[in-house]
């Protein structure tokens, strides 16, 4: 039945057009943002999970950054200890050479003095972010971030206290530079021509061996900490990638699917507009019934 008061066909076509426009707006939003769930109203449960996981991922990345700082501290100290071992071994070689009757003792002493200066230079240069583990009392300790744990309240970093004084090359002077009266190399720094005399070479070699033992132990400690930090950093990176991937599966839009849906909805919109136009024109047909 055709009525001049109510155009049911037009009402139906208009409702269809509204639905198509609503779906089209949603799809266009997904295509432009890349998100299937961009706001809580899209899916409150998934949006809440994604928001929490993004926050956790930020904390994991912050922990990874802290691990990077810790790794840098350890690497600087490790490099310093390793260089010191090389220099002390060179001093050891010079001392052993004194057993040769053809060796010029004065030249050996000149070389040893240069090596002593090199040890001081290594100690003074081994600083990162204001911390120098190569200078300090035998009881000196330093804290370094070595890992992190995830708890119900979030992500917390874990630290390890390193007794750096057990392998510190020298004590720390009032001016912040090496004080050669302390540290594992203090006795080597105190070598004089007397220490290189034939009667004292054996004692001096024992001093060198003691220092090498302390430095080797220090290198082992630093190496194990460095390895642990590397493993934790690798885990943090993998965990961050896994979280990001999980969030993506929850809220990201399938662009191929959305693109296909967009094309279909645009076609539906055109058809709905035509349908509404046809429905509206039906009232004009009633007028033709009254024309002579």
Kindly label every feature range from the protein language model.
Residues 129, 262-263:
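Short loop/turn microsegments at loop-to-beta-strand junctions
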Residues 259, 266, 270-273:
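Extended, low-aromatic, Leu/Ala- and acidic/polar-enriched alpha-helical coiled-coil segments
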Residues 1-12, 16, 32, 36-253, ...:
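Amphipathic alpha-helical coiled-coil/heptad-repeat segments
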Residues 253-262:
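A glycine-biased, small/acidic residue-tolerant capping/turn segment at secondary-structure junctions
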Residues 23-24:
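N-terminal glycine-rich anion-binding loops that anchor highly charged ligand groups
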